[in-house]
């Protein structure tokens, strides 16, 4: 029984791979939540707080690398960061934001293959041309031809090793201010090409575009969204529309950004740290998250001198 069949039968049993677990979540009743992360620390925190799946955000990883979300970081750099996430939270599904696939079908399938090898559950590619700009900045978002993008999807599906590895197709038609018909047509074409899930993106400040899309969507392929700008509805509200998953794409990084900026300002202004201790995490919380006590126990176990008398009989 594959992960899709498990979800249909209400079976929450473990699956063989991270891809299988993500596939299960996308087909289970309701809308799953994927927390945006950018490194091993943010992944550990998200999982410790109960998230069952993670989104390795291109914006957040690029920002953590100190560059813009405009394909300035190489895909090998980003997948190195993804590896820190899968190492930090083994078994937890990580869906990787693969931007446009960094070129043609060949670079897209190479990206997907490398993501699979570092332990990711799946990849998501968007239908803009390379190089891209972040969807929430500016208006110059040119889309790739449908046939070209479908070729990327097919190439990735043909090359995957794990049958449960998830390939998500993201359309930027609404971001590019194209008609709803264009978004629906592209979604249908991408599903036909083999996409395991669809990501419908909007930057309106209400969910109306998403609601309209779901009312008119006749396919069975799961639909993901990232409600970054239309942030009033709850997960349950989106589930009622038929959404399979909500991606909280960049909130962890933005929270860290604000906290780091504020503490830097405070220390510089106060010329000391006497006023910030109650605003930062205690070291014991960090030691606890990374199981320092476990390491100490292992040291006692593995570095004690052997009892030579016992060894010699």
UniProtKB/Swiss-Prot annotation:
Please state the Enzyme Commission number of this protein.
5.4.2.9
Keywords for the protein's UniProt record, in alphabetical order: Antibiotic biosynthesis, Isomerase
- Which BP terms from GO are recorded? antibiotic biosynthetic process
According to the record, the segments passing through the membrane are none
Give a GO molecular function annotation for the protein.
phosphoenolpyruvate mutase activity
Catalyses: phosphoenolpyruvate + H(+) = 3-phosphonopyruvate
Superkingdom, natural source: Bacteria
Question: Which residues act catalytically here?
Answer: 69
Pathway the protein contributes to: Secondary metabolite biosynthesis; bialaphos biosynthesis
Q: Does the keyword Isomerase apply?
A: yes
Q: Which family does it belong to?
A: Belongs to the isocitrate lyase/PEP mutase superfamily. PEP mutase family.
- Biological role: Formation of a carbon-phosphorus bond by converting phosphoenolpyruvate (PEP) to phosphonopyruvate (P-Pyr).
Q: In its UniProt entry, what is this protein called?
A: Phosphoenolpyruvate phosphomutase
Source organism lineage? Bacteria, Bacillati, Actinomycetota, Actinomycetes, Kitasatosporales
Q: Which gene encodes it?
A: bcpB
